[in-house]
Amino acid sequence: MDEGTQFLVTELERLLSLPFDSKSQVEAWYAESKRVQRELPERFPDLEYPHEVWHFLADADIRARDAGYRQYQEKMMTDYIRRVRDENRVA
């Protein structure tokens, strides 16, 4: 797995593990998400990844209000992480 993909997958796993139940937790989540959003293009400008990753990084307020959307986005991210890890096990 290339360094950029490893960075992204690790950060997504970390973001998925952060608490997300109160307004202050959502605000803290956004702060971490913004850091990732800054670092990705700075460190890995050519990294390609699914468009849904940006929605995940930007839509925490919607996930906080809509449990169905939260489940959908979290599943999209865990599926992406699993797919990337599986592809690299085979390679």
Where are these regions (language model features)?
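Amphipathic alpha-helical binding modules
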Residues: 52-91
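Short runs of predominantly hydrophobic/aromatic residues within well-ordered alpha helices
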Residues: 5-8, 46-50, 73, 77
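Short acidic/histidine-centered micro-motifs embedded in hydrophobic/aromatic stretches
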Residues: 11, 32, 52, 56
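Short terminal alpha-helical segments
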Residues: 1-31
